[in-house]
Amino acid sequence: MEYRFLKSEVRENGIVVLTLANPASLNALNSATLQEINHFVMNLPESASLLIITGEGKAFVAGADISEMADFNAQQGLDFGRFGSEVFRRIEDLNIPVIAAINGFALGGGCELAMACDIRIASAKARFGQPEVKLGIIPGFSGTYRLSKLVGQGYAKEMMYSGRMIDAAEALRVGLVNHVVEPEELMPYVNSLAEDIVANAPVAVRYAKECINRNYDMSETDGIELESQLFSKCFDTEDQKHGMKAFMEKTKPEFKNR
């Protein structure tokens, strides 16, 4: 598939960079862009070890495309919301880590896209918000669910009821992002973090992600049992044998993803 609104890079170590590249619209999410993201995520190379998502220009994603939504009826709104949520859930469920490198505005669907990623690193110039109520709607791509999980119901309600934007420092304070860096340091910081992650045992990283993600919907007892089961499965991997041997021999491990 030839992409109109996306650019991508695949590095030798398996790190994949996906850039939303429609800066004239501030990378707004329309149906075509969502289709492209969906196709890209479903067709990641088998060698992919980590995905970085960022935006071109002054926005990460400044929201959904209002010009497309303006004449929706209820059924069209349902279809659009469900598809966006499906795409973002597919990103969340990838068996590799996903980092959002938030270079600018992350509003509405852009904030929702960032929240579907495992880790969020923000430029000091980034701005966040769920301003949908100013347009007569509510978040439609699972924002009410994920924002409440990340920052708590009280703060999520304040953001959604008021429609106000918050800056990167406030996003860091409330737990919406992991780190804030100067704009020129955003990609170097994200690249360094990505390289640290992919240097670790891929199966172990995958199991850690599975535990954390699935714990959302589990009781404490079931979540702890899942951890025990996946912890035990690590001992059937070559990477565990090699990693512990390298530790005891004070050498650097080279993991094989098996």
Model-derived features: positions:
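Conserved CoA-thioester-binding segment of acyl-CoA-metabolizing enzymes
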Residues: 1-56, 89, 187
